[in-house]
């Protein structure tokens, strides 16, 4: 399974999930699903926004896990 590392990146940067939510143009429900890897798809524009806001390459936003959903 592939999951987003957004929460880990925020922690590394000393920022909060709420801070990121305020930067994104999403409803809180959709934002929360996305950062908690509870969604089956992510729009490219959201990946681009995450990459720019968190100042990291898109590839660093993901990690592969052995976990199956």
Give residue spans per PLM region.
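The alpha-helix within a helix-turn-helix
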Residues: 10, 21, 51
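Short alpha-helical DNA-recognition segment
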Residues: 15-33
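Short, basic-rich loop-to-helix N-cap that marks the start of a DNA-contacting helix
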Residues: 39-49
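A short, Lys/Arg-rich alpha-helix, primarily the initiator
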Residues: 1-16
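Short, charged recognition helix plus adjacent turn
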Residues: 8, 33-34, 62-69
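Residues within the helices of the helix-turn-helix
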Residues: 7, 18, 48, 59
């Amino acid at each position: 399974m592939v999951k987003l590392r957004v929460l880990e990146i925020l922690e590394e940067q000393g920022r909060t999930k709420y801070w990121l939510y305020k930067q994104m143009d999403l409803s809180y429900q959709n934002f929360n699903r996305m950062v908690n890897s509870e969604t089956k798809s992510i729009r490219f524009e959201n990946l681009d926004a995450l990459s720019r806001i968190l100042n990291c390459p898109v590839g660093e936003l993901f990690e592969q896990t052995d976990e199956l959903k």
